[in-house]
């Protein structure tokens, strides 16, 4: 385990200030290659040095590569044993853990499976066939893209159908059945015990919004939440 002076070594004044501020929010704004991830991992190590249990720290990032790099850095800085106890990974990988724990409250089995893009396209094709819709008009990949956009804006099938502007836009594009395809696709996924990648984010939002028990349980586990590349989030 590094001591505080070793953790701060090689950092400039602003970076040291960010690493050593262990209470309250901290926002790091800098260009590519400026050492943002180094500051984030340094801050985690500094917090651990102050006595925080590693399982009280949640660290999130976007890509598997970035998550692997963060884990490697932490193993070097604090030792492999402590690094393994940190709740650290991509948004999707961490959220999957939480969703499995509370899946039944969302209508899914805890053993739900994850659709990749190919699986989702096949499911959309099945929906189009069931609805007797022309897949040359409703191109499966385009339909999936529209559904993905809705989910990334936290729009459920019910909310989409109730959104007059969205329905009007689809009708203007000569694709008035998008809302119904979305609803059928979502129903089929839930019935099969399946989530796609966008569902992981959407359902995590729904879980924390609507399930106070889950919100309390998850929020009380962590004293610190750190996010790398936060500018890539939707909000």
Where are these regions (language model features)?
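Conserved helicase NTPase motor core
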Residues: 9-20, 24-28, 39, 58-59, ...
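Conserved adenine-nucleotide phosphate-binding loops and their immediately adjacent elements
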Residues: 1-7
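Walker A/P-loop NTP-binding motif
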Residues: 38-53, 69, 73-77
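Conserved P-loop NTPase-based nucleic-acid remodeling module centered on helicase motor cores
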Residues: 56-61, 65-145, 155-159
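Short acidic/histidine-centered micro-motifs embedded in hydrophobic/aromatic stretches
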Residues: 94, 143-146, 150, 203-204, ...
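The conserved Walker
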Residues: 30-32
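Basic/charged alpha-beta structural segments of nucleotide/phosphate-handling enzymes
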Residues: 125-194, 198, 212
């Amino acid at each position: 385990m590094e001591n505080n002076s070793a953790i701060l070594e090689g950092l400039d004044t602003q970076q040291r200030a960010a690493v050593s501020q262990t209470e309250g929010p901290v926002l790091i704004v800098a260009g590519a290659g400026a050492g943002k991830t180094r500051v984030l991992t340094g801050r985690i190590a500094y917090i651990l040095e102050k006595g925080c249990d590693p399982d009280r720290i949640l660290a999130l990032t976007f890509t598997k590569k970035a998550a692997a790099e963060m884990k490697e850095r932490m193993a070097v800085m604090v030792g492999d044993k402590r690094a393994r106890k940190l709740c650290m990974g991509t948004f999707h990988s961490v959220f999957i853990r939480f969703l499995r724990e509370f899946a039944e409250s969302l209508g899914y089995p805890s053993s739900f499976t994850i659709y990749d893009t190919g699986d989702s396209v096949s499911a959309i094709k099945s929906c189009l066939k069931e609805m007797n819709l022309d897949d040359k008009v409703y191109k499966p990949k385009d339909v999936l893209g529209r559904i993905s956009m809705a989910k990334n804006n936290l729009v459920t099938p019910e909310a989409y159908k109730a959104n007059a502007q969205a329905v009007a836009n689809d009708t203007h594009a000569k694709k008035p059945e998008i809302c119904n395809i979305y609803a059928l696709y979502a129903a089929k996924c839930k019935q099969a015990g399946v989530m796609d990648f966008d569902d992981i984010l959407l359902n995590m939002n729904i879980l924390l919004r609507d399930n106070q028990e889950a919100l309390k349980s998850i929020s009380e586990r962590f004293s610190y939440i750190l996010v790398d590349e936060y500018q890539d989030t939707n909000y």
